[in-house]
């Protein structure tokens, strides 16, 4: 158990049945001891990524923002957001996953604060189902 987690609080969450089935399979395979542990770890990792976006400064980073979205619902707003961030978007790759869904990968370079702002805006677009930002420092740290 991590420091600060000695006072656990019981809560409940609602998840799609297929997601819970995958969680149960991971537990059965021995990757995690329990549902609680897998959800705690997932929350920790997600919160660490979000906290980075809140504290990052003007240091230069390289990165990739990958996201899946519902084409008809999200595309107009995504194009608008991308045009507001041409200063950090180096390249865009667009893939048609199905008739309804697309995947895009944005290659990024620029101030971390600006990259974080772009990721936040993309995640906030209705119809974006998943988004993941991966960054590396231009200093190699």
Curated annotation (Swiss-Prot):
Binds 1 nickel ion per subunit. One of its GO terms (biological process) is response to nickel cation. It holds the Pfam family NikR_C. It comes from the Archaea. Its cofactor is Ni(2+). SUPFAM superfamilies: ACT-like, Ribbon-helix-helix. Keywords: DNA-binding, Metal-binding, Nickel, Transcription, Transcription regulation. Transmembrane segments: none annotated. GO terms for molecular function: DNA binding; DNA-binding transcription factor activity; nickel cation binding. Ni(2+) binds at residues 83, 94, 96, 102. HAMAP family: NikR (MF_00476). Transcriptional regulator. PANTHER family: NICKEL-RESPONSIVE REGULATOR. Belongs to the transcriptional regulatory CopG/NikR family. This is Putative nickel-responsive regulator. It comes from Methanopyrus kandleri (strain AV19 / DSM 6324 / JCM 9639 / NBRC 100938).
């Amino acid at each position: 158990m991590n420091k600060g987690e000695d006072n656990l609080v019981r809560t409940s969450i609602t998840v799609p049945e297929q997601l819970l089935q995958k969680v149960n399979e991971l537990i059965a395979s021995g990757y995690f001891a329990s549902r609680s542990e897998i959800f705690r770890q997932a929350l920790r990792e997600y919160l660490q990524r979000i906290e980075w976006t809140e504290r990052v400064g003007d240091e230069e980073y390289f990165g990739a923002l990958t996201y899946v979205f519902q084409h008809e619902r999200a595309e107009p707003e995504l194009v608008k957001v991308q045009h507001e961030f041409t200063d950090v978007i180096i390249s865009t790759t667009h893939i048609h996953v199905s008739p309804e869904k697309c995947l895009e990968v944005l290659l990024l370079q620029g101030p971390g604060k600006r990259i974080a702002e772009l990721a936040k805006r993309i995640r906030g677009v209705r119809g974006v189902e998943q988004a993941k930002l991966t960054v590396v420092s231009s200093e190699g740290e």
